[in-house]
Amino acid sequence: MASELAMNNSDLPTSPLAMEYVNDFDLMKFEVKKEPVETDRIISQCGRLIAGGSLSSTPMSTPCSSVPPSPSFSAPSPGSGSEQKAHLEDYYWMTGYPQQLNPEALGFSPEDAVEALISNSHQLQGGFDGYARGAQQLAAAAGAGAGASLGGSGEEMGPAAAVVSAVIAAAAAQSGAAPHYHHHHHHAAGHHHHPTAGAPGAAGGASASASGAGGAGGGGPASAGGGGGGGGGGGTAGAGGALHPHHAAGGLHFDDRFSDEQLVTMSVRELNRQLRGVSKEEVIRLKQKRRTLKNRGYAQSCRFKRVQQRHVLESEKNQLLQQVDHLKQEISRLVRERDAYKEKYEKLVSNGFRENGSSSDNPSSPEFFM
């Protein structure tokens, strides 16, 4: 068993242990173990693996150069095949993989995975530069002993990482450009490879270049096609991430597209024609704003009309009051004239009785006419 574990990378496809591991690995029920991985635990496990000495060149002996192992993993003792198999089944080396593989994308059969592994039997050189730099930083933190477990070359990628890249290539080739998966992959790659990048498009481009490099380094047809598909998906995710702020900025700028006066004076048909292609929430918000403005304008118009009508009524009231005063003055003048004429008449009547005496047959006397 120790001789089988000490095989080189060229014997990986024909190894019974590797084939048994691939057959036992249920790709249809892929799960990622969600456990926090501490640096000191990784360093101690790397040191323990180096002290064993028998796993320095096997696919499962590169947790530091490829991916941190499960906390339940330990160096197997030679001669215990069942314990080694149990450790291999419990070895979740996908928890720290930089691209955060989505289990929904692994919708292929085990035969396709075996073909992908066979086509990617050779080591990938220079495909994942950012991944190699991360391995070098981890090896520098672990010390000289952990650096020796990396094989003396930080740019050389471990066989476990080659297996992971083959699985990702086959998944991308069969599942196509899944929007949710590539979007998630884009964010994860941007987080691991470019922690200081602020633009989503830059992170998407980096993930696309990393996927494309992985596919080109494999040399196999499945690897090249899968890598190209992954790269295209990463670029699409980057473009989508770049378009999201554009849509948001367009929505913010769309609010200033119509002024308040235009919203109020514009007809409903014209407004609907202008709002074609706009999101439903934006249309509802603009129509609510238009309704609010129209109600506000209607209230202001009613208030203005009431004030104007009050002014008109007050002016008419003043005119009527002036006319009443004028009529009162006219009445008082007529009353004075009437009193004067009455008094004058009484005087004439009294003077006529004195002049004529008691002669009643005089036609000029007032009694004759009365």
Curated annotation (Swiss-Prot):
> Which regions are flagged for Basic residues bias?
180-195
The known PTMs are summarized as:
Ubiquitinated, leading to its degradation by the proteasome. Ubiquitination is triggered by glucocorticoids.
Region (Represses ARE-mediated transcription), start-end ranges: 126-370
Tissue-specificity statement: Expressed in tubules of the renal cortex and hepatocytes. Expressed in the lens (at protein level). Expressed in pancreatic islets and endothelial cells.
Observed effect of gene inactivation: Knockout mice lacking this gene exhibit small eyes or microphthalmia with an absence of normal lens structures, an abnormal chondrocyte development, with terminal differentiation of hypertrophic chondrocytes initially delayed, followed by a subsequent expansion of the hypertrophic chondrocyte domain in the growth plates of embryonic and postnatal long bones. They also show a lack of IL4 production.
Q: Where is the bZIP domain?
A: 285-348
Please give an example of a GO cellular component term from this record.
cytoplasm
Q: Where do the record's region annotations for Basic motif lie? A: 285-310
GO biological process entries: cell development; gene expression; in utero embryonic development; inner ear development; lens development in camera-type eye; lens fiber cell differentiation; megakaryocyte differentiation; negative regulation of transcription by RNA polymerase II
Q: Does the keyword Transcription apply?
A: yes
Q: Quote the CDD domains the UniProt record gives.
A: bZIP_Maf_large
Q: Where is this region: Leucine-zipper?
A: 313-334
Positions bearing the Glycyl lysine isopeptide (Lys-Gly) (interchain with G-Cter in SUMO2) cross-link: 29, 33, 328
What PANTHER family would the database entry show?
TRANSCRIPTION FACTOR MAF
How is this protein named in the record?
A: Transcription factor Maf
Native species: Mus musculus (Mouse)
What high-level taxonomic lineage is stated for the organism?
Eukaryota, Metazoa, Chordata, Craniata, Vertebrata
